[in-house]
Curated annotation (Swiss-Prot):
This is Large ribosomal subunit protein bL34. HAMAP family: Ribosomal_bL34. It holds the Pfam family Ribosomal_L34. Keywords: Ribonucleoprotein, Ribosomal protein. The keyword Ribonucleoprotein applies. GO terms for cellular component: ribonucleoprotein complex; ribosome. GO terms for molecular function: structural constituent of ribosome. GO terms for biological process: translation. Belongs to the bacterial ribosomal protein bL34 family. It comes from Geotalea uraniireducens (strain Rf4) (Geobacter uraniireducens). The gene is rpmH.
Length: 49
């Protein structure tokens, strides 16, 4: 049986990325909560050159 987590940077960004979060009201609430908590990473971001 295949494992459930098959990592892919593309699908990760498309589902949990910053722009996706900002596109809905609830997503903005997520970012707001994480800012208030003092998270270093507000949303998933893939390091690129």
């Amino acid at each position: 049986m295949k494992r459930t987590y098959q990592p892919s940077n593309v699908s990760r960004k498309r589902t949990h990325g910053f722009l996706v979060r900002m596109s809905t009201k609830n997503g903005r609430l997520v970012i707001k909560r994480r800012r208030a908590k003092g998270r270093k990473n507000l949303a998933v971001s893939i390091a690129s050159k």
